[in-house]
UniProtKB/Swiss-Prot annotation:
Enzyme Commission number(s): 1.4.99.-
Pathway recorded for this protein: Amino-acid degradation; D-alanine degradation; NH(3) and pyruvate from D-alanine: step 1/1
Natural source organism: Pseudomonas putida (strain ATCC 47054 / DSM 6125 / CFBP 8728 / NCIMB 11950 / KT2440)
Entry keywords, A to Z: FAD, Flavoprotein, Oxidoreductase
A biological process from GO: D-alanine catabolic process
SUPFAM superfamilies in alphabetical order: FAD-linked reductases, C-terminal domain (SSF54373), FAD/NAD(P)-binding domain (SSF51905)
Gene symbol of the encoding locus: dadA2
Protein name per its UniProtKB record: D-amino acid dehydrogenase 2
Pfam families assigned to the protein according to its UniProt record, in alphabetical order: DAO
This protein's GO CC annotations: cytoplasm; plasma membrane
Gene Ontology MF, one: D-amino-acid dehydrogenase activity
Disulfide bonds: none
Amino acid sequence: MRVLVLGSGVIGTASAYYLARQGFEVTVVDRQPAVAMETSFANAGQISPGYASPWAAPGVPLKAIKWLLERHAPLAIKLTGDVDQYLWMAQMLRNCTASRYAVNKERMVRLSEYSRDCLDELRAETGINYENRSLGTTQLFRTQAQVDAAAKDIAVLEQSGVPYELLDRDGIARVEPALAGVKDILAGALRLPNDQTGDCQLFTTKLADMALKLGVEFRFGQDIQRLDFAGDRINGVWIDGKLETADRYVLALGSYSPQMLKPLGIKAPVYPLKGYSLTVPITNSDMAPTSTILDETYKVAITRFDNRIRVGGMAEIAGFDLSLNPRRRETLEMIVNDLYPRGGDLSQASFWTGLRPATPDGTPIVGATAFRNLFLNTGHGTLGWTMACGSGRLLADLIARKKPQISAEGLDISRYGNSREVAKHGQSAPAHQQ
C-alpha cells in the first residue's frame, strides 16, 4: 500500500519513518531542499512532556492584555484583517476555562509522554544521536506568586504520575551550577527530571536517513498545489502540475495545512504562532546551562546542545509574516545576559524565526478525516519536537488499522465538530499559497 506524506518537517518525517516500519511504501514531498527546513529548523530543542500545556488557560485573557503593553512580553498580537485569525483567537478564548484547560492538558500530556517513550525506544534500538541529553527541565520562577501558581500544574503532574521536584535557590544551583551567581534574582523552580533536550533538525535529518534505508522516497523542491477528490476519497495530489496518486495521504504541512483542507470542506483551526530563537556558541562550558531552563516570566527556553546554547520563545499572532523583529532578539539577549552572562558569545549568535502550527485548544490534530484515505498530523504548536515520534507512530497504527498503544480519544479533527461542506461530485482544491 502506497502512502504519500505531504511535508518533511519532524512530524512528516516521523510519520514516514513509522509507516515504513509497518511495511508501507512511502513517498515524502516538500517544497524545501531538505527535511526540517521550516518550523523544525531551529526550535528551542526541548522535549518536555511534563510542561505540555495549552496556551489557552484560565487567566490568560487578562495576562494577554497586560503583555500587550510590555516591551519584552511573551505574547504579541498583530491584527491582519484575516477572518481566520479572529475566529482562531475567539476559539482560544473559549478554551480559557478551568474545565477545558484540564481536558486539553490531559490530551497533550498523554501524547507527549507516549512520544517521549517512543523516542527512548528509537534511541535504544538505533543509537541515533542528535546532541541529546536526558537531564531534565528546570522552570525558573522569579517571583513567589509564580511559585504559588505552579500548584495547579503540580496537581496535574501528580495526577498523571509525572515525577517532579520543587527547588529553592540552593537547589537551583545544584542542578544548574552556572545559575549559582544569579540565584538571588530567583524565587524557586520546578524541575522535571525525565525531560530531555536535543537538536530537532539534526534528529530529523538522521531519521530521514534511516527512513531512506527502509525504502522511503524523499522528493524535495516540489510545489504541492492542490488535492483532487471525489465523494469521500482523495483521488490524488497535484504536484508541479502532475497528479500524484496513492492509497493513503498524510497531510503534515504545519501552518499551511488549513489552506489545503479548506476547499475540501474541512475546517482545521490551525494558525501560525510566530516564534524566535537565538543559537549562541558556548565560550565557557561551566557558565552555560546543563540542560533546559524555562524562564516563566518571559516564556523563554534556554537549551544546551554540545557546543551551543539555543534560546527560544515568544509567540506572535501575526499571520504568515516571517520577518525578523529586532525587538525579539533584544529580549532573548536580555534573558541570556540575566541568567548566563558568561556562557556564550552573543555577537556570534544566529537569529531565526519560524511559524508554529497551533490549535486553539493546544492539542494537535492527529488521525482520520471525513475522507476515507486522508489523514492529518498537524497543529502541534510549540510541542512538535516533543510530540513527533508519538504522533508519527500513532498515525501509522491508525492507518494500518492496528490498536494504538495509547488512546486516540480527542486527538482527531472530529473534536471540532467538523462536517464537510462540499458538493458530492469530484472537485479539486485550488493551489495553496505559501
